[in-house]
Amino acid sequence: MNINKTMCATTDPSFAWKSIDWKKCEAQVKKLQERIVKARKEGRHGKVKSLEWTLTHSFAAKAIAVKRVTTNEGKKTPGVDGALWSTDKAKYEAILSLKRNGYKPQPLRRVFIKKANGKLRPLGIPTMKDRAMQSLYLLALEPIAEVTADPHSYGFRKERCCQDAIQQCHTILSRKNSPKWVLEGDIKGCFDHISHEWLLNNIPMDTKILKKWLKCGVIFKGELFKTEEGTMQGGIISPTLANMTLDGLSDLLATKNKRVNRKNEKYSPMVNMVRYADDFIITGRTKETLEEIKPMLIEFLAERGLELSEEKTLITHIDDGFDFLGFNVRKFKGVLLTQPSKKSVKKFLDSIRYTIDSNKSCKQETIIRLLNPKIIGWANYYRCGASSRTFQKVDNQIFQKLWQWAKRRHPKKGKRWIANKYFHFYKTRRWTFLVKSIKNGKVDIFPLKFMFDTKIIRHKKIKSEANPFDVEWKSYFEERMTYKMLLSLKGRKSLLYMWNKQKCKCPLCGENITAEIQWNVREQKENGQIVRYLVHDKCYKQNR
């Protein structure tokens, strides 16, 4: 499969974009990021600054920045200028336009999205150019952020996920002598209230560029509003800025909570912190320990322009349990259980019911195609917890709703007729909602997925000190990627063979094919034979 591309000088921007050697670009950027990490660990701040400048002024980094904003989910969402880089010509010209000198970001376009509680969350949508500039500077800032990050911070960090945070909760709370009390932290409007002064004084990046982003303003209903605090919620670099704002809390708790008992023997008050973006918990041996921590927490946040919500910040006994990242964590008769929270189950079932009710006249196959991705996605998220019983209950609720859907379609038919039409014996189950069709003389069966079929697998947590930008951790992340892919390809020998044959790489972009990024099997004719490859979905769409 001839997929090698080279960077070349050409007068045709469309051809120039297609001729970019993405493997070479990724390699150049990765090398500079590794050097930034090395210099930062050695305390060579001048060298870090120099490498940041080199990276943000390189063609390779600019090309990757443009590629990311034109392939992510927001690629079809314009800013205030209405511009979208949908052509190869526009993309290549965008690379050439990313310059520090004379750069002036445009105001954000204010939109509102619904939160889980029904309230509206404000988002600021930057223009495509501003997104690309943020993506460019993020390439230089992210490696530094990883070096300085709290070890048990898991949100919006490369190679980390919600399941890592939940597994860390399980690690620190599951033992017999584990802490019994938990402080559930809630920060009032974290993104909206971060101090600009604190960011400009503490974020190790080009302060002129950062200040322009922070002060660019917001346009809503044709009116321009100044931004005096907070970071652009909706900006590519915003989650990293928020993370760096909250980093340091773990060290503060560690230094302030070394106590001595009466026998002059040091003991730990069992203070641990687990954070995912602005959601966090802090554990303690006693309720009094956590009450003493609250003033420290308030002071730490106040320095950054943030405020702890007194109403929503709770101190809970582990036997009563608490909700965190969609899971409920509690001890029952001394055994720690992490299972889907009642709120999460209700929200999911409401989504399922809405999908079914919105498609009353659709074909059965359409309903199955709409529901299967939801069922698989939700089950995969919660498969790391004690979720089997919940999965069974959810399956039953979905069955009841589909039975109502089928009865409504045929009000004059009996139950047996409806059951025979829509529900069939499949594998070991009698009541499987499925469609049978005959194509080319073969019977195709398309069943609805059962959540209970999802195997419960304890998540293998990332090592807290692991840094994906540090060359010293390269072999660790390669082993971790292999483990995840083996898990996702278990029982699919042909796919596993292709993955190994391709040396884990996508043949179009040269990047790793992992369980986290969507991929598919694509066919190509070579020397009169059909050859199959594993390819990233986004790469295939770009190269069609």
Positions of predicted regions on the chain:
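Histidine-centered nuclease catalytic patch
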Residues: E511-R544
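Short metal-coordination and nucleic-acid-contact micro-motifs, chiefly zinc-binding Cys/His arrays
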Residues: W499-C504, R532
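Conserved polymerase palm-domain catalytic core
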Residues: S97, N101, T148-H152, R157-R160, ...
